[in-house]
From Swiss-Prot:
<dbReference type="GO" id="GO:0012506">
    <property type="term" value="C:vesicle membrane"/>
</dbReference>
<keyword id="KW-0554">One-carbon metabolism</keyword>
<comment type="function">
    <text>Part of a complex that catalyzes the formation of methyl-coenzyme M and tetrahydromethanopterin from coenzyme M and methyl-tetrahydromethanopterin. This is an energy-conserving, sodium-ion translocating step.</text>
</comment>
<feature type="transmembrane region" description="Helical">
    <location>
        <begin position="86"/>
        <end position="106"/>
    </location>
</feature>
<comment type="subunit">
    <text>The complex is composed of 8 subunits; MtrA, MtrB, MtrC, MtrD, MtrE, MtrF, MtrG and MtrH.</text>
</comment>
<keyword id="KW-0489">Methyltransferase</keyword>
<protein>
    <recommendedName>
        <fullName>Tetrahydromethanopterin S-methyltransferase subunit D</fullName>
        <ecNumber>7.2.1.4</ecNumber>
    </recommendedName>
</protein>
<dbReference type="Pfam" id="PF04207">
    <property type="entry name" value="MtrD"/>
</dbReference>
<dbReference type="GO" id="GO:0005886">
    <property type="term" value="C:plasma membrane"/>
</dbReference>
<dbReference type="InterPro" id="IPR005779">
    <property type="entry name" value="MeTrfase_D"/>
</dbReference>
<comment type="pathway">
    <text>One-carbon metabolism; methanogenesis from CO(2); methyl-coenzyme M from 5,10-methylene-5,6,7,8-tetrahydromethanopterin: step 2/2.</text>
</comment>
<keyword id="KW-0484">Methanogenesis</keyword>
<dbReference type="GO" id="GO:0005737">
    <property type="term" value="C:cytoplasm"/>
</dbReference>
<keyword id="KW-1278">Translocase</keyword>
<feature type="transmembrane region" description="Helical">
    <location>
        <begin position="230"/>
        <end position="250"/>
    </location>
</feature>
<feature type="transmembrane region" description="Helical">
    <location>
        <begin position="47"/>
        <end position="67"/>
    </location>
</feature>
<dbReference type="GO" id="GO:0030269">
    <property type="term" value="F:tetrahydromethanopterin S-methyltransferase activity"/>
</dbReference>
Length: 250
């Protein structure tokens, strides 16, 4: 077990970095929860973990697809990032259409008087008794940034786990077509998803309900979540590396 840990210390470090990126990314995603579902709060009307996991897992799938054709890490991370950003962007666009044309409210934030990006007044359009509604531009941009960071984090975790399995007994040296369809893909994906959920849940306790994006006062709490996720990711990395190494890459 000690040999497995020492032999894969670099990949464990990358897994930990990926987990920290995932945790940080959650704070960028505009989460409105149940109030947003009723257009009584700014953000997307679902939970923190669901949104983060949706974007991150889409990025993981994109990264896995890219690994069919190349073992270039920057390209794999870019693919995962873009995949996650597209997913969260489409989610926010559809949500905005429903809020504007279905509910009939103007996307606006109750956290700031002026949108930091468009400089449009927000307080004039916030309905009485609500904490904003819809997805103003600043929340949209923040969500895309969060999706990108989460996609990079998830891709980094998945790539590292694949490499751990490769070094544990598979013939191929890098991540190439020979990995496609192999059982190692399933095992690495399971661990990557697990690590992603762990690091998505921790910030949800830190946020405590809803958050509009990087302009929200709650965003300043991110260092606490990042430190907690750093510790959790180290533990997850140890378990994942030891398990995959003991299985000999399946």
């Amino acid at each position: 077990m000690i040999d497995a840990i020492l032999g894969n210390i670099i990949w464990m470090a990358l897994i930990t970095i990926g987990g920290v990126l995932i945790s940080w990314s959650v704070h960028f995603v505009p989460v409105g929860g149940a109030p947003a579902a009723m257009a009584q709060a700014t953000g997307i009307g679902t939970g923190t973990v669901q949104l983060a996991a949706g974007a991150g897992l889409t990025g993981l799938v994109s990264a896995g697809f890219m690994m069919n054709v190349t073992d270039n890490l920057p390209l794999i991370l870019a693919s995962g990032s873009v995949g996650a950003m597209i997913m969260i962007a489409v989610t926010m666009i559809v949500g905005s259409i429903v809020y504007v044309y279905g509910v009939g409210v103007v996307p606006s934030s109750a956290k700031v008087k002026v949108d930091p990006i468009t400089k449009y007044r927000q307080d004039l359009y916030v309905s009485q008794g609500t904490e904003g509604h819809g997805l103003p531009t600043v929340s949209y941009v923040s969500g895309i940034i969060g999706g990108g960071l989460g996609g990079i984090g998830g891709s980094l975790v998945y790539y590292s786990l694949i490499e751990v399995g490769m070094s544990a007994g598979l013939e191929a040296v890098g991540v190439t077509n020979s990995v496609t369809g192999h059982e190692l893909v399933a095992v690495a994906a399971i661990f990557a998803i697990g690590i992603f959920f762990v690091n998505a849940v921790i910030p949800s306790y830190n946020i405590g309900g809803t958050i509009e994006g990087f302009h929200d006062p709650k965003f300043k709490k991110w260092p606490k979540a990042v430190v907690s996720s750093l510790v959790a990711s180290i533990m997850c990395a140890i378990v994942a590396v030891v398990a995959i190494a003991q299985l000999g890459g399946i």
